[in-house]
Each structure stands twice: as structure tokens, then as C-alpha cells.
Swiss-Prot record:
Highest taxon of the lineage: Bacteria
InterPro entries: Lysozyme-like_dom_sf (IPR023346)
GO terms assigned for molecular function: hydrolase activity, acting on glycosyl bonds
Protein name: Probable transglycosylase IsaA
Family per record: Belongs to the transglycosylase family. IsaA subfamily.
């Protein structure tokens, strides 16, 4: 579906003084909840903002859990990276050291603004050993990858389930990743939801039902999945 995105800088969205962090990287308790919610919202719904700018000046290491997702934002003062992984835990107060990621991970998203290699440095991913991240170049584009770990309860990673239910590699890369980052539970402020970020009822279903819904949607609206991919590439929405 067509979506209108109103862009804003990190300074406007999150305050010109950064994220209410002191010089020792500890969070002000009275301000952390709001800032964590804003950071989480950017990671889920507007990752290009995080790709374009560090969240604050200087080196930092910000980690917290929000709505079941564990978020980590790091910088050495020159380059920066961020990622989030679903762990299913309760919201926690941020710490300056990243905690080990849960082994039941089904999907994650991450970004690094360093050179375009096939993996980020080990110190940036030490808490997410099950995540296969793809680094992105220094542009406002967003790059993410689903976890390669499998889960008996879900039948494999999100990408594996998508491909097993009729989805294609091309559709995953051209539609799913730009729209939702591979997160089947993604919901943006305008109400678009799921892997394909539509307002269709199947957008809140299982990965299998979302995959089949996306294929039917592409066939009925564009004539074929390939035609839908071409439209998404040309227009930036579908």
C-alpha cells in the first residue's frame, strides 16, 4: 500500500541534546523511558534515520529491552552501529554492557555504517552470536538480515518460513526487507503491519499466512509477484 513518510532529523525527533545520557553513558531514570521508546520506534519504523546519523556525539553503548525486543546502539566516536533482536523479555533499564541474547531468536535487524563487508566486527556483535548481519554503505539505505537460527515452534527463521510458503528470494530482498526489515510483527504509526506493511487482515497472522497473503495481494493488484517487485523498485511502495 502507498505510505507517506514525514522525515525528521534525529535531533528533532529525539532532542538536540541526544538521548538524555550523561558523560559516563548512564541514563537519567526520569527521561530514559521516553527516549528508549523513541529509539525503539525509529529502529522499527524509520531505520534510515539511524543509518544516517549516530544517536549522540562521541562514543556510547546503549542497551535496553522494549516490548520484547532487545536494542543495542554503539559507537566508538567515528563509526556507529545498531541492532535489535526479539528476546521476549520484559522492559528493562538500559545498561552500559550488552547482555547475552536469548537462544530462541527468530529474527533480528542490524546496521553498521562501516565499510560494506559481509559481517560486522566481533565487538559490535558479541551479544548476538546467532545473528548474521550485513553491513551497509554510508548512505541512508537500511540493510538487515534475518537470523539463521531455527526454532521448532515456528518451523525455522522468518526468511526460511517465507521461502517455504511460496515467497521468493527476490520478493524477500525487494519487498520484505525494505518494508519491515523481516519483522512479521512490525507496525508503523500509520497502521501498516507485517512483513509486507499493508493494512490487509493477514498482516497480523503467522509468517505462512502473511507470505500467502502477500503473494495473493501481488497477483490481484499487479498481476504477478515479479510485477509487484518491479513496481516496488520503481516507486518505493507497493
Amino acid at each position: 500500500m502507498k505510505k507517506t513518510v514525514i522525515a525528521s532529523s534525529l535531533a528533532v525527533a529525539l532532542g538536540v541534546t541526544g538521548y538524555a545520557l550523561t558523560t559516563d553513558n548512564s541514563a537519567h531514570a526520569s527521561e530514559s523511558t521516553t527516549n528508549y521508546a523513541q529509539l525503539a520506534n525509529l529502529a522499527q519504523n524509520n531505520p534510515s534515520e539511524l543509518n544516517a546519523h549516530p544517536v549522540q556525539a562521541g562514543a556510547y553503548n546503549i542497551t535496553f529491552v522494549k516490548d520484547g525486543f532487545k536494542y543495542n546502539f554503539t559507537s566508538d566516536g567515528q563509526s556507529w552501529s545498531w541492532n535489535y533482536t526479539y528476546v521476549g523479555g520484559a522492559d528493562t533499564v538500559a545498561t552500559t554492557q550488552a547482555a547475552p541474547a536469548a537462544q530462541s531468536t527468530d529474527y533480528s535487524a542490524s546496521y553498521s555504517n562501516e565499510a560494506s563487508t559481509q559481517s560486522v566486527s566481533s565487538n559490535q556483535q558479541s551479544s548476538n552470536t546467532n545473528v548474521e548481519a550485513v553491513s551497509a554503505p554510508k548512505t541512508t539505505s537500511y540493510s538487515a538480515s534475518t537470523s539463521s537460527s531455527s526454532s521448532a515452534s515456528t518451523g525455522g527463521s522468518v526468511k526460511e518460513q517465507f521461502l517455504a510458503n511460496g515467497g521468493t528470494e527476490a520478493a524477500w530482498n525487494a519487498i520484505v526487507m525494505p518494508e519491515s526489515g523481516g519483522n512479521p510483527n512490525a507496525v508503523n504509526p500509520a497502521g501498516y503491519r507485517g512483513l509486507g506493511q499493508t493494512k490487509e487482515s493477514w498482516g497480523t497472522g503467522s509468517v505462512a499466512s502473511q507470505t500467502k497473503g502477500m503473494i495473493n495481494y501481488a497477483n490481484s493488484r499487479y498481476g504477478s509477484l515479479d510485477a509487484a517487485i518491479a513496481f516496488r523498485d520503481n516507486h518505493g511502495w507497493w
